[in-house]
């Protein structure tokens, strides 16, 4: 399973997010992926990529969200296949916090697209703004997306777990989302059809006339903080640093009130 091949990298990312590797007695066990029946085609694509016998079946059952829900299930029992996946980084049992990008070389674009298809969202907010996001409990996975997002778009994201559930929600919006989605969902790539369609719709979005992009977040350094504290006025500091007076005023207030540490 060469993860430099985008299709295998995609499949592995998808399996890390939505797959379940179960170990039975002796050498028995199985890989199982259950998703909505509307996305069954991706499981058939996995079946074709895998040189071992596997099956795609369906079932209908009641859930907490609907009276009936029809799902598609891909099942793979080969010990050799399970061993390969496990060695690459798909653990047995619960895995949400322990999964991480593989240690071998891999296609980051394919891998992250698989993760986003399984555990992320692509579309528009209630106000009509384009976005792409990924929710994960894994620090390594969140860091991987942040690093790739910076390389692809120049936008930086800081890692912080939600206080309510301890989950990371890495979010990109507006032009940055357009740029990242255009990079990840290129023509002919392996992906969920509905996510690919959503990605294509983002490309058509145009910012309203008169609406300006939000300026990039300032990365304050010790030298910048020292200048803020020693400048005779905020206006002098703003002119020297090339930032707005309001941004400099807020940063200086935080320094003087111990909201952020003073420069060394």
Sequence positions of predicted segments:
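Internal intein/HINT superfamily modules and their associated LAGLIDADG
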Residues: 1-264
């Amino acid at each position: 399973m060469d993860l430099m091949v985008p299709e295998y990298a995609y499949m592995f990312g998808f399996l890390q997010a939505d797959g379940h590797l179960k170990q039975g007695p002796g050498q028995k066990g199985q890989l199982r992926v259950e998703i909505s029946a509307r996305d069954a085609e991706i499981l058939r694509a996995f079946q074709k990529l895998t040189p071992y016998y596997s099956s795609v079946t369906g079932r209908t059952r009641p859930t907490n969200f609907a009276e009936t829900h029809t799902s598609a299930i891909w099942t793979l029992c080969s010990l050799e296949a399970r061993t390969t996946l496990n060695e690459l980084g798909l653990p047995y049992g619960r895995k949400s916090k322990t999964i991480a990008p593989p240690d071998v070389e891999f296609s980051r674009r394919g891998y992250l697209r698989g993760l986003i298809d399984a555990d992320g969202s692509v579309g528009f907010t209630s106000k009509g703004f384009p976005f792409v996001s990924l929710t994960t409990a894994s620090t390594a996975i969140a860091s991987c997306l942040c690093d790739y997002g910076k390389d692809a778009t120049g936008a930086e994201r800081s890692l912080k777990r939600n206080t309510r559930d301890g989950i990371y929600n890495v979010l990109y919006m507006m032009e940055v989302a357009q740029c990242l989605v255009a990079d990840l969902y290129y023509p002919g790539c392996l992906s969920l059809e509905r996510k690919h369609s959503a990605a294509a719709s983002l490309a058509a979005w145009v910012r309203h006339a008169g609406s300006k992009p939000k300026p990039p977040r300032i990365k304050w350094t010790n030298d910048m903080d020292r200048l803020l504290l020693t400048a005779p006025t905020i206006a002098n500091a703003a002119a020297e640093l090339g930032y707005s007076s309001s941004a400099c005023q807020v940063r200086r207030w935080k320094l003087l009130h111990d909201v952020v540490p003073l420069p060394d």
